[in-house]
Amino acid sequence: MSSTALIHDDEALEPTLQSILDQKTLRWIFVGGKGGVGKTTTSCSLAIQLSKVRKSVLLISTDPAHNLSDAFGQKFGKEARLVDGFTNLSAMEIDPNGSIQDLLASGGEAQDDPLAGLGMGGMMQDLAFSIPGVDEAMSFAEVLKQVKSLSYEVIVFDTAPTGHTLRFLQFPTVLEKALAKLSQLSGQFGPMLNSILGSRGGLPGGQNLDDLMSKMESLRETISEVNTQFKNADMTTFVCVCIAEFLSLYETERMIQELTGYSIDTHAIVVNQLLFPKKDNPCEQCNARRKMQKKYLEQIEELYEDFNVVRMPLLVEEVRGKEKLEKFSEMLVKPYVPPE
């Protein structure tokens, strides 16, 4: 009994993300935390490490601040693009607000819309925007579309600061509800709308209502499939990123509680910006800060004894560009050893 407990303890204490690299069934990896704790650096570094052990990796930023371009020093957009210097690591940045306009526009400007006279275009827009979280949910749909057409083996999400992250994970449910509602409306008013649309020249892009509904139905099926995958610990995990301070620890705890509520697996925490001053270091601020960090680190280890807690040092310069990111990423798999 005691030996089993000891083995479990050893496993729990491995202070690296190696277990994520070893778990070959993983398809979706979310990296999240509050603003300014090094989420993007961590997600880029994790993606770099994954690219060494997986056939193809896609790194997606859903943070409106889009820091991937800054991190790699290369412009990314809403189409997946290979990261310079890699053959199997691609990245893309999604604008949550752009996607729904694209979807509603699909096929022409508002002024060309044959439904504008009926106020139908506006009605569709109002209907769409009245669903909570729908703008970001559409960006999620955009991701799914890309991911389905480009078969990546593993997808890493660099998510927006905490609040948005958890909403992002609810999107499959939000979209499923919205699409179910639209299907119901289409069933009730479809024939009437089709005859009105027919006399007005149809929907933008020459679609009719049935085409639109079947598109939405196939989207709903994809979403429901992904929703199931998100709740499967073999396929999805969430890496929490924080710093050793009260507010960040509080946010992390809140996030872990919510993830557990959504049945989303999380078993790794990356603690960034740690100070390791030498014993005879005369810098009072460094020593005082280290003392505070030590207190919160102990709390993290106590609270999350069954988590892989990775301790990352505060570096003297920014982690930007391929070489620095690669160097930083090594510390995710080989524990950092501070100088004596």
UniProtKB/Swiss-Prot annotation:
Keyword terms, alphabetized: ATP-binding, Cytoplasm, Endoplasmic reticulum, Hydrolase, Metal-binding, Nucleotide-binding, Transport, Zinc
CDD domains registered for this protein in UniProt: ArsA (cd02035)
Binding site for ATP: 34-41, 245, 272
Location(s), subcellular: Cytoplasm; Endoplasmic reticulum
Any Gene Ontology biological process: cellular response to oxidative stress
InterPro entries with a match to the protein in the record: Anion-transp_ATPase-like_dom, ATPase_ArsA/GET3, ATPase_ArsA/GET3_euk, P-loop_NTPase
Top enzyme category: hydrolase
Chief place where the protein resides: cytoplasm
A GO MF term: ATP hydrolysis activity
Active site: 63
Entry EC no(s): 3.6.-.-
GO cellular component terms, semicolon-separated: GET complex
Pfam family, one: ArsA_ATPase
Binding site for Zn(2+): 283, 286
Function: ATPase required for the post-translational delivery of tail-anchored (TA) proteins to the endoplasmic reticulum. Recognizes and selectively binds the transmembrane domain of TA proteins in the cytosol. This complex then targets to the endoplasmic reticulum by membrane-bound receptors, where the tail-anchored protein is released for insertion. This process is regulated by ATP binding and hydrolysis. ATP binding drives the homodimer towards the closed dimer state, facilitating recognition of newly synthesized TA membrane proteins. ATP hydrolysis is required for insertion.
Known partners and oligomeric status: Homodimer.
Similarity annotation: Belongs to the arsA ATPase family.
Stated name of the protein: ATPase get3
